[in-house]
Amino acid sequence: MNGSLTKAQAGVGLPAVRHHNAALVLDLLREAGTEGISRLELAERTGLTPQAVSKITARLRAEGLAVGAGLRPSTGGKPRTVLRLVPDAQFAVGLHLDRDGLTAVLVDLAGRSVAVTTAPLDFGAPAERVLGAASDAVRDLRAAEPHKPVLGVGVAVPGPLDHRDGVLHRVTGFPQWDGFPLRDALAGRTGLPVTVDKDTNAAALTVSLSEPCGDFAYLHLGTGLGAGLVLGGEVHRGARTGAGEFGHQTLQLDGPLCECGGRGCIEALCLAAEARGDRAEAARVLGAGAANLVGLLDIDRVVLGGRTVAADEDAYVRGVRAVIAERAARGAGGAHVTVAVADGGDRPVAEGAAQLVLAPVFGRVGERG
């Protein structure tokens, strides 16, 4: 937040939205960090009455989510009591189930990863084995804070999938997952609420929460290639969570066969160039796809991530930036677009999975259909 709330964010004094108002207050406490924020500032920022803010903060303190953080001088009156969030009052688990590895994080209310585990994973193994690895990771992370509540588990996996029902569709290279109810199956194993989304959407959520970015595309190149889109400040999933299947856009009609059954997909061309050791070509291909997105969506920024990008960040940034600049020089737009790399390698995916659980706590549930 940056000082004022949009109409959708502003507090509304109706009983039916008490949770919404509490979420607004919690989000401002989170944003204030260790310095804290006064009740008067909370009322000014949310549009709620001072009385409503006092009731909400009293409840948050009783629940252990907020504590006093000292006094702050005021002009002409008595010092104001400052409140701050208690980050370790509650946690969320984030899981990134990749094609060949599992990353799991325990994230506190401030968004900090307090425990991280990684392990090999064969996403092509029987579902029971994959579920066992995922539930074991959740158990191990909960042991790091055994006496603190875990709100739920966010799971980020390759698409396509239906995030509303938590059901996987025909993941490229892994057709056995088609129709599998991952959300319900893992909830049954862990006893916790589970939210499922695409890995690229989870990473895009992490980027969008870390800094104001405007409209951007997050391009994840690892063992596969996909995109997460943030438009109007919200993760854009599409009507059926189909947005962002970027890797299987056709770039060369007579190109090499892709695992999806098509030819000349951006993913196939990128990974083939990497396999040949031609990283400059891989970056150029990724840049061509990125430039298409820039022209189609008029976005402000392209953010790159994934282990393949992390192996040579400079090469990928240069290559993608060069293609976008070349298109812009021909009048195709994109002169304003910046290209950057997401921090943390593959970690933003797992951390974004945890944010799928935490974001609603703070009223940050942006989603486009």
Named regions from a protein language model:
Residues 108, 163, 230:
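Short, acidic, Ser/Thr-enriched surface-loop or helix-capping motifs
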Residues 157, 221, 306-307:
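Short secondary-structure boundary segments
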Residues 82, 92-96, 104, 150-154, ...:
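Short glycine-aspartate micro-motif
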Residues 116-118, 125-130, 177-279:
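Glycine/GP-enriched mid-protein hinge/lid loop-to-helix segment characteristic of carbohydrate kinases
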Residues 160-163, 201-204, 226-227, 236, ...:
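Short, active-site-adjacent cap segments at secondary-structure transitions
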Residues 1-69, 75-79, 84-118, 125-143, ...:
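ATP-binding/phosphotransfer module of carbohydrate and carboxylate kinases, centering on a glycine-rich
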Residues 113, 117-215, 315-326:
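Glycine-rich phosphate-binding loop and adjoining helix at the ATP-binding site
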